[in-house]
Amino acid sequence: MDPLGPAKPQWLWRRCLAGLLFQLLVAVCFFSYLRVSRDDATGSPRPGLMAVEPVTGAPNGSRCQDSMATPAHPTLLILLWTWPFNTPVALPRCSEMVPGAADCNITADSSVYPQADAVIVHHWDIMYNPSANLPPPTRPQGQRWIWFSMESPSNCRHLEALDGYFNLTMSYRSDSDIFTPYGWLEPWSGQPAHPPLNLSAKTELVAWAVSNWKPDSARVRYYQSLQAHLKVDVYGRSHKPLPKGTMMETLSRYKFYLAFENSLHPDYITEKLWRNALEAWAVPVVLGPSRSNYERFLPPDAFIHVDDFQSPKDLARYLQELDKDHARYLSYFHWRETLRPRSFSWALAFCKACWKLQQESRYQTVRSIAAWFT
């Protein structure tokens, strides 16, 4: 008898057990990997970041097209280097604000700078001392910096100090990498489009709300010539008081609103038109870029441009004629039968940046913001 015979079954049993244990270990590793992958795909916030609260509402001006299914994107970490004007704002779920966008982790916690995929720098908050206020010059590989401003070039200092630092631009300019206008028009989703305008509530003629009063500015000089022929109610510092929270109620009593910009630059069409005039259902009388520039964003019969008149006196006469001719006045509201105005929000701007970063991974450098932003 072979002396090794009795031990053979035990050896086979141990070999089978080892094989089963090995297969079990492989299975555990495989399912653990699947679970981690699923967690990453859901966009769970990284630890230590500010909670992102949902912002509800209708789609808002994104030029993206809606789709039945949102494509998978990596969950990007975006750092706000400062709050805009040092004022915190509610942070959104970008998947609810921009069609086709996945959520990003957006935070103002500067400690995440080494891990951030992108950094948004609001120019106003760093412009007085860029060398001291910019993020550290040694950045993580692949991190993109976004230059952000809603102010005109006339109010942006030290742009030349930013040469070569930034990868993307974000502003009201339509040729920005990330276009964030002060307002836009979008189609109504249903009918009727709006209630009829109550002309009986329009008891006053022309209003202007202004906080930055500079006597030598183009807009103040034009106003001074206009008010020699037409009564204009001016609200703001050193003028009629306008208590907080009463602006829309006050301006809605007027038929016309002077949407005069503080400086003249391409695409610089601000809340003076989109909010102060259009949300108050007042016809905007605009002083800013050319009529053709306004018509890129508005129907030609949605506003009155000062350039259409040889003098402020001629404009005053035209406004007085419209005041007496209800049919002609109401023709400035026909566009509202199919369109409605929407306004800028900081949350939407951040989400447009989120969407852009997801869509375009190409790394570029803006050589000179000063040469472009004029």
Swiss-Prot record:
It catalyses: a beta-D-galactosyl-(1->3)-N-acetyl-beta-D-glucosaminyl derivative + GDP-beta-L-fucose = a beta-D-galactosyl-(1->3)-[alpha-L-fucosyl-(1->4)]-N-acetyl-beta-D-glucosaminyl derivative + GDP + H(+); an N-acetyl-alpha-neuraminyl-(2->3)-beta-D-galactosyl-(1->4)-N-acetyl-beta-D-glucosaminyl derivative + GDP-beta-L-fucose = an alpha-Neu5Ac-(2->3)-beta-D-Gal-(1->4)-[alpha-L-Fuc-(1->3)]-beta-D-GlcNAc derivative + GDP + H(+); an alpha-Neu5Ac-(2->3)-beta-D-Gal-(1->4)-beta-D-GlcNAc-(1->3)-beta-D-Gal-(1->4)-[alpha-L-Fuc-(1->3)]-beta-D-GlcNAc derivative + GDP-beta-L-fucose = an alpha-Neu5Ac-(2->3)-beta-D-Gal-(1->4)-[alpha-L-Fuc-(1->3)]-beta-D-GlcNAc-(1->3)-beta-D-Gal-(1->4)-[alpha-L-Fuc-(1->3)]-beta-D-GlcNAc derivative + GDP + H(+); a beta-D-galactosyl-(1->4)-N-acetyl-beta-D-glucosaminyl derivative + GDP-beta-L-fucose = a beta-D-galactosyl-(1->4)-[alpha-L-fucosyl-(1->3)]-N-acetyl-beta-D-glucosaminyl derivative + GDP + H(+). Residues 35-374 are lumenal. It is found in: Golgi apparatus, Golgi stack membrane. One of its GO terms (biological process) is protein N-linked glycosylation. Gene3D superfamilies: Glycosyl transferase family 10, C-terminal domain. It is a single-pass type II membrane protein. The keyword Membrane applies. The keyword Nucleotide-binding does not apply. Changing residue 101 to T: Does not affect 4-galactosyl-N-acetylglucosaminide 3-alpha-L- and 3-galactosyl-N-acetylglucosaminide 4-alpha-L-fucosyltransferase activity. Residues 1-15 are cytoplasmic. Its EC number is 2.4.1.152, 2.4.1.65. Belongs to the glycosyltransferase 10 family. PANTHER family: 4-GALACTOSYL-N-ACETYLGLUCOSAMINIDE 3-ALPHA-L-FUCOSYLTRANSFERASE FUT5, ALPHA- 1,3 -FUCOSYLTRANSFERASE. Catalyzes preferentially the transfer of L-fucose, from a guanosine diphosphate-beta-L-fucose, to the N-acetyl-beta-D-glucosamine (GlcNAc) of an N-acetyllactosamine unit (type 2 chain) of an oligosaccharide, or a glycoprotein- and a glycolipid-linked N-acetyllactosamine unit via an alpha (1,3) linkage and participates in the surface expression of VIM-2, Lewis X/SSEA-1 and sialyl Lewis X antigens. Preferentially transfers fucose to the GlcNAc of an internal N-acetyllactosamine unit of a poly-N-acetyllactosamine chain acceptor substrate. This is 4-galactosyl-N-acetylglucosaminide 3-alpha-L-fucosyltransferase FUT5. It comes from Homo sapiens. The gene is FUT5.
